[in-house]
Amino acid sequence: MAKTAIQTSQENQPVIQVENVSKLFRTPNEGAISALQSVSLNISHGEFITVVGPSGCGKSTLLKLIAGFSPPSSGRILCQNEEVRGLNTKVGYVPQESKLFPWLTVEENVGFGLDSKRYPREKREHQVQQFINLAGLAGFEKYYPAQLSGGMSKRASIIRALAYEPAVILMDEPFGPLDAQTRMVLQDELLKIWEQKRQTIVFVTHDLVEAVALADRVVVITHRPGQIKDIINVSMKRPRNIFEIHRQEGFDEAYGRLWNIFRHELNIGMH
């Protein structure tokens, strides 16, 4: 089906606009701590953005501001051209911990976010099953979180955020606690789901290989107070083979540039 002029115009508009945003935290002992300073960033419809930077640089803070968990101290954030004021219901949020509801089954957890959409029962069941199948969890619909492995819990947590199809998915180091092999499998599955659904993803990670492997663009944040140091365009073609990512044309160039920038920030943080 051909896209209308309105649809094309909407897709060309940034889905997220971060405009000169700063964030201060006040502590009893240290006074005001500047977590982010003068951050501006536009994120397009369907983009996969990864965010990297030294520990404590404000990566997670940026996600929480976009999610509306707390307001910026100055500047503003827009989601689909509307300023974020309070909880942003247009985004899905995947934290580092799976945080599935232990009293709900896999299919109930995945369908939880759909309740607010008031889907007819048949459509709701189809949507839940579609994402369960995409995540390789078919056959585990009736399992409870305590019966799942760490990797399976993470899959369920991710598709719970994806299933109600928010405009943007915010992912805060979702694969951090997992072993290397499970991480690669989940990276591959995430990319396959994203290729089909093309939801906008903003993905925080401390893993530079992961950052390059997944992203259209990598945003590098400086040591605190966090500012955008650079944005690296990743020219690797899609679809990508996570299991042979080091051999893919464009990987070495993007990774080398990212490492040089990141190494400089680490050196600054140590002085």
Predicted regions and their residues:
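Conserved ABC ATPase "signature" region
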Residues: 111, 115, 122-140, 192
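Short coil-to-helix segment of the ABC ATPase nucleotide-binding domain corresponding to the Q-loop/switch region
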Residues: 104-111
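A short, flexible loop at the N-terminus of ABC-type nucleotide-binding domains that lies
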Residues: 11-15, 24-38
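Helix-to-loop junction immediately C-terminal to a conserved catalytic motif
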Residues: 67
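Conserved ABC ATPase signature
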Residues: 144-148, 152
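The feature captures the beta-strand-to-loop junction immediately N-terminal to the Walker
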Residues: 52-54
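A short, proline-enriched helix->beta-strand linker immediately N-terminal to the Walker B motif
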Residues: 163-167
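Conserved ABC transporter NBD signature motif
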Residues: 75-87
